[in-house]
Every structure is written in structure tokens, then in C-alpha cells.
Amino acid sequence: MTEQIDRYVSFRNVEWERRTAEVFALLQPHFDGSTSPFWDYFLRQRVIAHAQGLDDLRVLHNFLPTLKDLLEELDDERTLSRLEELEVLCM
């Protein structure tokens, strides 16, 4: 029997760190090849968040609507799907 995941009780068995790292890895080509000023801003905010002791899950959460809109515009279904999965399980 598969153990049920209840994000409101615990992140146990959710593997949020791995999932978050996967989303950032999928975002990397957008960081590297984009002319959009958003990506530079996003990465600067990530550095600030890390300096404040916040993790990448929080960074994604802070920019969730914008990220989803951009990924839709870029037709990046794979990254959008992983981001939405992370949203459902962990945010």
C-alpha cells in the first residue's frame, strides 16, 4: 500500500528538496538564454532569499504566478508540470 502524502501534516516522503532542485535545473536554460529582465531579477531575489536563510522552495513560492505565466508563454510544459506538481505537494 502506498503511503498517503499530507502536506499539511508533514513533508515526509514528499522529497521537496529533490523536486525543488529539479525545477531549478529545468529553469536553468531560461536563465542562461533569456533576454527577459525577469530572470535576472529572479536570480537576484534568490540570492537575497538565501542570505536571509530561505530555501529555493520559498523562492519558487514567492514567484509562483509569474513563473507559471512565463512558462506558459514559453510553452515549457515539462517545467510547468513539475512546478505545478511541487505547488500541489509542498506549497
Curated annotation (Swiss-Prot):
Organism: Gluconacetobacter diazotrophicus (strain ATCC 49037 / DSM 5601 / CCUG 37298 / CIP 103539 / LMG 7603 / PAl5)
InterPro entries in UniProt: CowN
The entry's keywords: Nitrogen fixation
Superkingdom of origin: Bacteria
Gene name tied to this protein: cowN
Name of the protein this chain belongs to: N(2)-fixation sustaining protein CowN
A Pfam family hit: CowN
Lineage of the species this protein comes from: Bacteria, Pseudomonadati, Pseudomonadota, Alphaproteobacteria, Acetobacterales
GO process annotations (BP): nitrogen fixation
Protein family: Belongs to the CowN family.
Protein purpose: Is required to sustain N(2)-dependent growth in the presence of low levels of carbon monoxide (CO). Probably acts by protecting the N(2) fixation ability of the nitrogenase complex, which is inactivated in the presence of CO.
